[in-house]
């Protein structure tokens, strides 16, 4: 068996495409899937107890799984940069506990949302749907 994946299925020529017996359209993650993705990607991060993954899932509607991973990585980078840029930061010294980044907050995620738009536009979603209908993707 051969499995292929593409972000632009409409760019594939018909002789190549017809060799695939099944075509599967994978849509953007649902609310539940986004919540699961935020649970997965924020689990290792230090976050404020008021950060709720169900709220993040609602906030980031229209974002792909890859976008959500990028958002979580951006959050971690944000608090690390803030630590390094703070006047209290000093190079670690043996015998002293190093300073730790602050906990990620909902405000941090809201700020990241203003800086990162979804990678998939409504125009692209319409094109995927049209292709899916035309080629009877599952």
Describe the function of each predicted region.
Residues 7, 21, 29-33, 48-51, ...:
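Eukaryote-biased feature marking scaffold/signaling PDZ-domain proteins and nuclear chromatin regulators
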Residues 16, 24, 28, 41-49, ...:
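Conserved NTP-handling cores and scaffolds of large molecular machines
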């Amino acid at each position: 068996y051969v499995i292929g994946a593409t972000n632009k299925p409409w760019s594939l020529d018909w002789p190549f495409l017809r060799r695939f017996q099944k075509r599967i359209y994978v849509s953007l993650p649902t609310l539940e899937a986004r919540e699961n993705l935020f649970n997965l990607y924020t689990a290792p991060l230090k976050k404020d107890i008021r950060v709720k993954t169900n709220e993040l899932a609602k906030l980031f509607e229209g974002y792909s799984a890859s976008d959500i991973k990028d958002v979580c990585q951006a959050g971690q980078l944000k608090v690390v940069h803030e630590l390094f840029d703070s006047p209290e930061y000093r190079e670690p010294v043996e015998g002293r506990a190093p300073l730790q980044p602050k906990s990620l907050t909902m405000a941090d995620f809201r700020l990241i949302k203003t800086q990162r738009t979804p990678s998939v536009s409504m125009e692209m979603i319409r094109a995927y749907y049209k292709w899916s209908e035309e080629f009877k993707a599952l």
